[in-house]
Amino acid sequence: MYYFDFFKRLLSSLVIGGQAINFIFKGKISKNDLFDQLMESGPGSLLIVLITGIAAGTVFNIQVASQLTSMGVSSEIGGLLAVGMAREMAPLLTATLMTGKVATAYAAQLGTMKVTEQIEAITMLRTEPVQYLVVPRLLSMVIMSPIQCLLFLSVALWSGQIWSTIFYKVPPIVFWTSVRSGNVSLTSADLTAMLIKSVVFGLLISIIACEYGLTTKGGPKEVGTSTTGAVVMTLVTVSLMDVLLTQILFG
């Protein structure tokens, strides 16, 4: 039963996403609403992204640096950290953070509007709910997800470099040379793959959260249930998509 509901929800989300993309191509975008959503998914989520990026870079660096230093190849620390972060940890952790911060807000906002009949009122005014409510949220996530991902990668690398220099005596120039041109180094292909993942994840987060919000029925209790369901389904879908994209991009 759970699997049936999962695929039913996923199909419904894809339909809503398709409708939103159709409105986007037709140029039916409210700039004011888009700006509001950009503020929520951008600056509103920036602090948790930066803090987690610093923590992830430091922890990853501790694990890698301790092993490489004992093997006498500490000059490769920067490259391994950069590649590991760009290919996997930055897009996936950023998506997880955005799910917790933004998807919950989308599902709760639209769910509340649904149970208080505000969406029906929008429809009666001959305004398409998907155009008015989903399009700005989808666009904001597609725009801000790669930006947040790049910021996450940047602070992770800087925290890793500082930790390597202080505790493992790796000169900054050695660390950054490894990032750019070591045996394992960060390439444009890695960055492209990271941005592709972040855009796809942002798209999934927005359409799934909006679908749960728009289909909420009942009262305040059901709004909470929809919000929880949106987070769970988003995390599962993003994880599965990450496996698929990793195989396509690096397999």
Region locations from a protein language model:
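Membrane-interfacial helix-loop-helix connectors in multipass membrane proteins
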Residues: 63-86, 154-199, 207-226, 248-251
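Active-site cofactor/substrate anionic-group-binding motifs, chiefly glycine-
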Residues: 41-93, 97
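Generic alpha-helical transmembrane segments of integral inner-membrane proteins
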Residues: 50-55, 142, 146, 150, ...
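Selective transmembrane-helix segments that form parts of the transport pathway or gating/packing helices
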Residues: 42, 46, 50, 89, ...
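Short cytoplasmic-facing helical segments at TM-TM junctions of multi-pass membrane proteins
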Residues: 110-135, 220-223
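Short, membrane-interfacial amphipathic segments enriched in basic
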Residues: 1-32, 212-213
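Hydrophobic alpha-helical transmembrane segments of multi-pass membrane transport proteins
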Residues: 77-120, 148, 208
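Hydrophobic alpha-helical transmembrane segments of integral membrane proteins
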Residues: 131-139, 228-251
